[in-house]
Amino acid sequence: ATFAFIILLWTLGGFNQDPFISETLSIQGEALSGSKLFKINCVGCHGISAQGLLGPDLHDATKELSDKKIINQVIKGLTPPMPSFEIDPQSMADLLAYMHSLNK
């Protein structure tokens, strides 16, 4: 029974959930603050309106990607030339809120 419980936790993500992601997802982000962060850090590649330049268009990105995948992309820079960013959970939650506001 213990082994089955461990397997269940593992498959549901109980053992492999990143604490940063968990904390970020537990915070209510502010889209206005996220917009300011975006303008400081992201417009060079994603454009002033997030329409895409060197980096992809981010409109509807939150419809296509989970918040967890977006967080990992930002903090790890998974697809070159995207750099990794050191960001605190509140700022990441704000950036996510801004990205959700870009949905058409």
Can you annotate each of these PLM segments?
Residues L54-L58:
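Short cysteine/histidine-rich zinc-coordinating motifs and their immediately flanking basic loops
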Residues S49, H59-K104:
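Extracytoplasmic electron-transfer domains, predominantly the class I c-type cytochrome c fold
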Residues G14-Q17, S22-E23, G44-C45, H59, ...:
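Intrinsically disordered, low-complexity segments enriched in polar/charged residues with Gly/Pro
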Residues A1-G29, D88, H100-K104:
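Post-cleavage N-terminal segment of exported redox proteins
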Residues S26-Q51, K68, N72-K76:
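Sequence/structural segment immediately N-terminal to covalent heme-attachment motifs in c-type
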